[in-house]
A protein has these predicted regions:
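A short helix->loop->beta-strand "cap" motif at the edges of active sites that frequently abuts
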Residues: 107-112, 154
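Alpha-helical scaffolding segments of alpha/beta enzyme cores, especially the outer helices
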Residues: 93-96, 100-107, 140-147
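Serine-esterase "nucleophile elbow" of acetyl-processing enzymes
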Residues: 1-52, 64-71, 75, 286-288
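Conserved catalytic region of serine esterases and O-acyltransferases that act on ester linkages
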Residues: 151, 174-289
Length: 289
């Protein structure tokens, strides 16, 4: 039996990859890349400890001890984007939490999977003055995870340098989480790394979605219903957070436009967590598109 324990935030929880729950009238749930990867492991026993909104410190405090009790053969730690929006953002504290989490899992004998987050410059359009501080923080978190991965010898997927990660089909309608295709990409990349490292694996996940991606009408329907509430939430948390970061950088004299690309960069924050948007409704309406 292969015990696979998945720690992290909503990316690992599977948000963006809806599946039907068992039983008549049951509400749809999430699958995600960890479940897809588990299918390619020998006799898998999957435990997803990831939670919505988790930061690095949350993973260390709330998920690590339970993960160690499960004595994992394979463990994943994919986290970081929620950290970027915190007012008390500190690369040193993130490095401490992530280092302790990954180091503890490695010391327990687990093969640990980690990931560099994609470049936050693709989907979510905000002015460059707000885009740059978030891009800078994401870059700092990737540097932290690079150091942690090198120190402990993790299997480290560089999603930031993966061209396929920037295909619009890889993202759900909210543009904040991977779509089923995106989750399959992550699962395939980790599967390939495990195979290359000599870990016994079965067939890799199919790159093609098993569910019909939502069509244009389905996306418009989501925007007209669930999307309206989403816009309101984003207007009262994401935008003020980005404005606050921009103001702090300006006051501290650290705002350097040249360091994070040209003004007007488009942002995509795939790991940013939001309340349950009932995205599965998109799958149900896919045939309408």
């Amino acid at each position: 039996m292969t015990r696979f324990v998945a720690l992290g935030d909503s990316i690992t929880l599977g948000v963006g990859d809806p599946v039907a729950a068992a039983g008549q009238g049951s509400r749809r749930g999430w699958r995600g890349w960890a479940a897809l990867l588990a299918e390619g492991l020998p006799d898998p026993s999957l435990h997803i400890l990831a939670t919505n909104g988790a930061c690095s410190a949350d993973v260390e405090r709330d998920q690590l001890s339970q993960a160690l009790q499960l004595r994992p053969d394979v463990a994943s730690v994919v986290v970081g984007v929620n950290d970027t929006l915190r007012a008390n953002f500190s690369p040193d504290r993130i490095a401490s939490a992530a280092g302790h989490t990954v180091g503890s899992l490695c010391s327990a004998g687990a093969v640990v999977l980690t990931m560099r987050l994609p470049d936050p410059g693709r989907m979510l359009g905000v002015p460059g003055v707000m885009a740059r501080p978030l891009a800078r923080r994401a870059h700092q978190i990737n540097e932290v995870m690079d150091e942690v991965a090198e120190r402990y010898g993790t299997l480290h997927f560089d999603a930031a340098a993966d061209a396929e990660a920037y295909d619009s089909r890889m993202w759900a309608a909210d543009r904040l989480h991977p779509s089923e295709r995106g989750h399959r990409l992550i699962a395939r990349r980790f599967h390939g790394m495990l195979a290359e490292a000599g870990y016994p694996v079965a067939e890799p996940p199919d790159p093609e979605p098993s569910n019909t991606p939502p069509g244009r009408l389905a996306v418009l329907a989501w925007l007209a219903t669930k999307g309206t509430a989403w816009v309101v939430r984003r207007s009262t948390d994401l935008v003020p957070s980005l404005v606050g970061m921009a103001i702090r950088e300006w006051r501290e004299g650290t705002a350097d436009p040249a360091s994070c690309g040209a003004p007007g960069v488009r942002l995509d924050v795939p790991g940013l967590d939001v309340p349950d948007l009932d995205v599965p409704n998109l799958a149900e309406a896919a045939e309408a598109g």
